[in-house]
């Protein structure tokens, strides 16, 4: 079996590529990073380590690398022969990989076996969005192709090693794929197959992503370098846990998850965040605050839905306010957000980026927490 995976970064090698290799696929990584691609072509294997004592490294073999800028025709040929195409490039880059995917699918013969194209991105409906991008580039031709939506979860921190291919990850992983519209399921080890993926995507978004983001933004306020350091602070942990119980109420109300099971899920997530061996930098988790403060993302969306249910999301509002205080000059979105606050004020910034209007109850709740944080900062400095 053959798989083509777009994105030879840490998630691609340490999660998706690893599971595909363990499932029996020959994996070709497609990327524009010369160092990684050349190393893959020369070595044809790499190692994955785990941020936990007593867990051995795994050798991932039968891998290759192709630079899509230098050898686009080769990528097309590989897709034309693939059983599976996956991506882990980031939501904003799906439109960049779509043309090659479209060309490769159109090169397939009508009688060819089905091919599955799965976007393994940190977003809702990633494969459906990728399909739209592929259709906009010329479609799939006569190919027998499926685009099942997926949800993925594994913490892979920023890291540097002498070996450019080595990657270290947490032991936990979750890869959920939707079965709707599939005639059969492609063989992938470690995947959970579900009929309706929406609840699982939102559970992950409103728990893992919400908690991670809040820990990073409050941790940054308190001068913490890593997520595990942040969670050692009583106040950070209190807000994170409180926010996850707020989103937990919402998830139980919407999807009927079992209360005890979800409470255990929350504690498992927090324990993952606390892993000191991950050394997960606050700056990595906090990056791109404009995207994370978007109306359909991990912070504002659950807060709005809780308000619609008559519940004030105080801890979420504090986390949102902390995100509005976040500043990292090396993060362009952080700089843009801070400039907007300086030039137009906090209320206008909330309206522009969070799509929350001045006078809304949620807006006022966030403003109250924003000013509370400002007062708390003054007290810490004095």
Curated annotation (Swiss-Prot):
GO CC, alphabetical: cytosol
Residues where NAD(+) binds: 3-14
NCBIfam families hit by this protein: PRK02318.1-2 (NF002646), PRK02318.1-3 (NF002647), PRK02318.2-5 (NF002652)
Name of the protein: Mannitol-1-phosphate 5-dehydrogenase
Pfam family, one: Mannitol_dh
Keywords assigned: NAD, Oxidoreductase
Similarity-based family: Belongs to the mannitol dehydrogenase family.
Catalytically driven reaction(s): D-mannitol 1-phosphate + NAD(+) = beta-D-fructose 6-phosphate + NADH + H(+)
Keyword Chaperone listed: no
């Amino acid at each position: 079996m053959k798989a083509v995976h777009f994105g030879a970064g840490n998630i691609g090698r340490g999660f998706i590529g690893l599971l595909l290799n363990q499932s029996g696929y020959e994996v070709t990584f497609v990327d524009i990073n010369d160092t990684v691609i050349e190393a893959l072509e020369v070595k044809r294997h790499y190692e994955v380590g785990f941020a936990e004592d007593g867990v051995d490294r795994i050798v991932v073999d039968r891998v290759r690398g192709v630079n899509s800028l230098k050898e686009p025709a080769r990528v097309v040929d590989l897709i034309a022969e693939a059983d599976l195409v996956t991506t882990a490039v980031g939501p904003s880059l799906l439109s960049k990989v779509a043309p090659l995917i479209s060309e490769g699918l159109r090169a397939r013969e009508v009688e060819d076996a089905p091919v599955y194209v799965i976007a393994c991105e940190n977003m809702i409906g990633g494969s459906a969005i990728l399909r739209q991008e592929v259709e906009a580039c010329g479609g799939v031709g006569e190919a027998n192709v499926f685009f099942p939506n997926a949800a993925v979860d594994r913490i892979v921190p920023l890291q540097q090693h002498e070996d450019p291919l080595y990657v270290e990850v947490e032991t936990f992983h979750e890869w959920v794929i939707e079965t709707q519209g599939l005639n059969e399921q492609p063989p992938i080890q470690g995947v959970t197959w579900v009929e309706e993926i929406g609840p699982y995507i939102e559970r992950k978004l409103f728990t893992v992503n919400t908690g991670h983001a809040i820990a990073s933004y409050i941790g940054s306020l308190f001068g913490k370098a890593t997520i595990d350091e942040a969670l050692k602070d009583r106040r950070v942990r209190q807000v994170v846990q409180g926010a996850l119980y707020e989103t937990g109420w919402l998830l139980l109300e919407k999807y009927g998850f079992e209360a005890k099971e979800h409470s255990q899920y929350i504690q498992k997530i927090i324990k993952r965040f606390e892993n000191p061996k991950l050394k997960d930098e606050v700056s990595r988790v906090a990056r791109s605050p404009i995207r994370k403060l978007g109306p359909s993302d991990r912070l504002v969306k659950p807060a709005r839905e809780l308000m619609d249910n008559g519940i004030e999301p105080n801890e979420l509002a504090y986390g949102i306010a902390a995100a509005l205080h976040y500043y990292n000059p090396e993060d362009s979105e952080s700089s843009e957000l801070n400039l907007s606050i300086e030039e137009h004020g906090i209320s206008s910034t909330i309206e522009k980026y969070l799509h929350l209007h001045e006078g809304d109850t949620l807006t006022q709740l966030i403003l109250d927490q924003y000013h509370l944080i400002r007062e708390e900062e003054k007290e810490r400095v004095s």
